[in-house]
């Protein structure tokens, strides 16, 4: 029986013919909504957010890279997102609304278009088993999208604390706060480069009075419209901010390849009105764009393992229910 269950967890999924960089694709979760899966520094575990079929809110879970050992590490209260391991694999941090109450905060109103809710998240640090959680930000507006510097000393994250969605850094104890971006618009989803000298992120900055008014109006309601975003890179101190892509549509979830020279990200630029996002790889200077996934379903939130040998991402492929999002892992083939 144990071997049968393990075989189910390790279910192989065929790659599309155009997915030449992906070998030995395995599906790690089955059912519900699963996303934002990130490797531990050792590459042995994955932390991700999961909304089970009978639950109304995302919580943080950890599992081994073969899909075994699945367990919840957040409190089960409120909504959580953006979990990440510290460099010692023994601690984690994530964003949660649990301080505002145990209930799941309501979903946004989509009657005027697709929007993301900017819930009252704060960032918490906990042991890897979920015990000992403590709050390291205390801000009445959105603090989330946190990731860790390679040396383990700095958290980079997105905050609405000054009335705009900007990127900040802080120490792992929540001190030494520094604002890195100041242009009106959504700067978010930051990750450090492997050497810690750069930060890759997604951004959209309104260019017209109408776009600025729409953005400010939504921000006042703790909402943002994520339909136009491009990939950007800046130095870790916030200088030399430069746009990498100019594709149109929504380009998000960027992550550096371990070589520090390339960036993988998700995009729907081929059909900006579609949910058919695919993964793309591009040089950090914006050259040599290459499509990685060719599946007709949603593919996003990619992350390379620390050694660059594996890729983990979230996808609607192979779902038993339309729109179901699961976590997949594949061996990365560098030169097919």
Mark where each language-model region is.
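Predominantly a core beta-strand signature of beta-propeller blades
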Residues: 24-27, 68-71, 120, 131-134, ...
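Sec-dependent signal peptide recognition
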Residues: 1-7
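A flexible loop/linker signature enriched in serine peptidases of the S9 family
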Residues: 30-33, 49-60, 75-80, 95-122, ...
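A short helix->beta-strand "capping" segment at the edge of beta-propeller domains
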Residues: 13-32
């Amino acid at each position: 029986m144990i071997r049968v269950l393990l075989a189910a967890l390790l279910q192989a999924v065929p790659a599309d013919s155009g997915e030449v960089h992906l070998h030995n694709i395995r599906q790690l979760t089955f059912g519900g909504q699963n996303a934002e899966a990130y490797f531990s520094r050792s590459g042995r575990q994955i932390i991700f957010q999961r909304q089970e079929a009978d639950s109304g809110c995302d919580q943080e879970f950890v599992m081994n890279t073969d899909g075994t050992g699945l367990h919840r590490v957040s409190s089960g209260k409120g909504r959580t997102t953006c979990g990440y391991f510290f460099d010692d694999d023994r601690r984690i941090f994530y964003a949660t609304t649990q301080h505002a109450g145990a209930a799941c905060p309501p979903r946004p109103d989509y009657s005027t278009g697709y929007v993301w809710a900017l819930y009252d998240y704060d960032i918490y640090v906990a042991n890897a088993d979920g015990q000992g959680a403590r709050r390291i930000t205390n801000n009445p507006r959105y603090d989330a999208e946190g990731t860790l510097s390679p040396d383990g000393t700095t958290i980079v994250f997105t905050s609405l604390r000054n009335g705009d969605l900007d990127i900040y850094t802080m120490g792992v104890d929540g001190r030494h706060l520094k604002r890195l971006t100041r242009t009106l618009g959504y700067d978010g989803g930051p990750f450090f480069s492997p050497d810690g000298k750069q930060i890759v992120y997604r951004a959209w900055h309104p260019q017209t009075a109408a776009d600025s008014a729409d953005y400010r109006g939504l921000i006042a309601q703790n909402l943002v419209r994520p339909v136009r975003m491009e990939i950007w890179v800046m130095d870790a101190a916030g200088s030399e901010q430069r746009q990498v892509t100019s594709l149109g549509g929504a380009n998000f979830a960027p992550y550096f390849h371990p070589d520090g020279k390339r960036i993988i990200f998700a995009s729907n630029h081929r059909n900006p009105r579609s949910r058919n996002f695919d993964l793309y790889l591009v040089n950090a200077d914006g050259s040599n764009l290459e499509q990685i996934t060719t599946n007709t379903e949603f593919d996003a939130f990619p992350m390379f393992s620390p050694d660059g040998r594996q890729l983990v991402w979230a996808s609607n492929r192979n779902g038993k229910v339309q729109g179901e999002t699961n976590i997949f892992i594949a061996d990365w083939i560098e030169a097919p």
